[in-house]
């Protein structure tokens, strides 16, 4: 047995076997039950699946956000979000993602072994990342041309403020305009990033055919609530945020819903193209 176990891909023995057999084995069973191996294989495949989920989610999200920040910085006369805002956003988002190791895994994924494919991460990132940027740019346009002018500057866009206001009032309106814009994108980013996790985590139809674990769902929910209330708190004032009017959420809800539908469609196209 020892000779055969040495040349085998995986040698299996029990703890009551002779020493030479146990030394040759890769796995030593504490019980005489091979079902332990099945459980270990299933848990290993679940761990691999959730690891891939997190890597793809984070890579595509960061790529999309980076593209959005670069584009907005080139097009807008001010920064779309301060560095401290980005750090706080990523900190809370990553905290929400900490429940991914306990997420549910589709049974179809664990039926057969999967291989590590680093190239698939780049492909997925290129497909999903720009999808998020497209929605972000649509949000930028809405907040810059419609939302902020309506609630801050009496219908005047940022570039035209100097022709309508002067002195301290001009500076005050500019600061309020930027704060309102940055706050809107800060909240919209957390909503979209957190909810799109449910679109990316499965190849099935999310919420209907496949549901996330309770841990992941609850952390997502609390993360969204926490980010949403920050602008209304003292911490929000310290960070330079502005209190959002309730009408902002009338825009946010359909925007995030459209983003979720769009990501699901792009994901289906990606799976069809790369299967």
Model-derived features with residue positions:
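Hydrophobic residues in alpha-helical membrane-spanning segments
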Residues: 3, 78, 131, 232-235, ...
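Membrane-embedded transport module
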Residues: 8, 13-205
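Acidic, divalent-metal-coordinating active-site segment for phosphoryl/phosphodiester hydrolysis
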Residues: 1-8
